[in-house]
From Swiss-Prot:
Pathway assignment: Protein modification; peptidyl-diphthamide biosynthesis
Organism: Kluyveromyces lactis (strain ATCC 8585 / CBS 2359 / DSM 70799 / NBRC 1267 / NRRL Y-1140 / WM37)
Keywords: Cytoplasm, Methyltransferase, S-adenosyl-L-methionine, Transferase
Gene this protein is translated from: DPH5
Pfam families: TP_methylase
Reported function: S-adenosyl-L-methionine-dependent methyltransferase that catalyzes four methylations of the modified target histidine residue in translation elongation factor 2 (EF-2), to form an intermediate called diphthine methyl ester. The four successive methylation reactions represent the second step of diphthamide biosynthesis.
GO cellular component, one term: cytoplasm
Protein name (Swiss-Prot/TrEMBL): Diphthine methyl ester synthase
UniProt-annotated binding residues for S-adenosyl-L-methionine: L9, D85, G88, S113, V114, L164, L222, H247
Entry's localization field: Cytoplasm
Record-level GO BP terms: methylation; protein histidyl modification to diphthamide
A single MF term (Gene Ontology): diphthine methyl ester synthase activity
EC number, UniProt record: 2.1.1.314
PANTHER family in the record: DIPHTHINE METHYL ESTER SYNTHASE, DIPHTHINE SYNTHASE
Amino acid sequence: MLYFIGLGLSYETDITVRGLNAIKQCSRVYLEHYTSILMTASLEELEEFYGKKVTLADRELVESGAEELLRDADKEDVAFLVVGDVFGATTHTDLVLRAKQRNIPVEVIHNASVMNAVGSCGLQLYNFGQTISMVFFTDSWRPDSWYDKIWENRKIGLHTLVLLDIKVKEQSIENMARGRLIYEPPRYMSIAQCCEQLLEIEETRGTEAYTPDTPCVAISRLGSASQTFKAGTIKELAEYDSGEPLHSLVILGRQTHELEIEYLLEFCDDREKFKQDVASDQEYFKPPAWVPPPEDED
């Protein structure tokens, strides 16, 4: 059996009882270590809590070396651990399909992730649209396909969850080209850098899917004892020190409910200004009034 087990957001104890019991019966345990990190638990703490050796599975092992993960999983129990929920990345779906193609039994054990815990900032989950990822820009690569998704969400009044990039055990382009197994230090995108990149692409596109004055919520270390929320405009959050990782951002939709706004006021420096920013943003994206069709005189 190949178990896919979600670990939750922060602590070794966030795992479900069912997930922990599954780990204890596995002969091999892998921890996916490149789409997210468990913020407050080290590898050693996980191994002590599980009573099992845990092998870190980086991008290369999961995407290129799946043979190692799937080895003998049709004969013995193997666990693949994922921070948050199991299906937070398409890579995990691909791994499930590979296992099923080999007739390896698969069991999925879910857990909390940023996709549902984001509601703790006060925004209602059913008011969210498409989620996007913001990657680190480079001198030669500044992708902006996510811009269209924000535009689509905002046109129909929905919030946009922005997942901020992390780089763990990544190689530079030069080292990859030279075949050198030298890895860059870990990097975690800050709220300020995300907002700067948002503003850069808006200036390039110029269709005003959002503006510097669009209201947002900065989310830091979600699910931990030190989690924080900060409400402000993109321009304001581009100067915000969000502290230690991990971080996410929510761009508000124009249909923000009054209860959502009331909740967000707890995280503002200037409540009256934030209410005005929200009102202005909602007015900008307000659809034209409905005009009934002319009656047929016949």
